[in-house]
């Protein structure tokens, strides 16, 4: 699964880790995160994330 990076603050969403503090279980692909999820560091929406080149 591909990682995604926040273009505002640089936070990297790693599907292997998820975002359990905000209700996203490990193993959840970026596409399957709810549309109302926001970056846990800066609060922007999913539309401010791009696929990581890593």
Curated annotation (Swiss-Prot):
Its cofactor is Fe(3+). Residues 1-54 form the Rubredoxin-like domain. It holds the Pfam family Rubredoxin. The keyword Cytoplasm does not apply. Induction: Up-regulated upon exposure to O(2). Repressed by PerR. The keyword Iron applies. Coiled coil: none annotated. Fe cation binds at residues 6, 9, 39, 42. Keywords: Detoxification, Electron transport, Iron, Metal-binding, Oxidoreductase, Stress response, Transport. Rubredoxin is a small nonheme, iron protein lacking acid-labile sulfide. Its single Fe, chelated to 4 Cys, functions as an electron acceptor and may also stabilize the conformation of the molecule. Functions as an intermediate component in the electron transfer chain: NADH->NROR->Rd->FprA1/2 in which Rd serves as the proximal electron donor to the FDPs that exhibit H(2)O-forming NADH oxidase activity. Also functions as the proximal electron donor to the Dfx and revRbr proteins that display superoxide reductase (SOR) and NADH peroxidase activity, respectively. CDD domains: rubredoxin. InterPro entries: Rubredoxin, Rubredoxin-like_dom, Rubredoxin_dom, Rubredoxin_ET, Rubredoxin_Fe_BS. This is Rubredoxin. GO terms for biological process: alkane catabolic process; oxygen metabolic process; response to toxic substance. Binds 1 Fe(3+) ion per subunit. Its EC number is 1.-.-.-. Belongs to the rubredoxin family. PANTHER family: RUBREDOXIN, RUBREDOXIN-1-RELATED. It comes from Clostridium acetobutylicum (strain ATCC 824 / DSM 792 / JCM 1419 / IAM 19013 / LMG 5710 / NBRC 13948 / NRRL B-527 / VKM B-1787 / 2291 / W). One of its GO terms (molecular function) is electron transfer activity.
């Amino acid at each position: 699964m591909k990682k995604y990076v926040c273009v505002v603050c640089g936070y990297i969403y790693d599907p292997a880790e998820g975002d359990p503090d905000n209700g996203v279980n490990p193993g959840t692909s970026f596409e399957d995160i709810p549309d109302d999820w926001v970056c846990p560091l800066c609060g922007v929406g999913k539309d401010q994330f791009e696929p990581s080149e890593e």
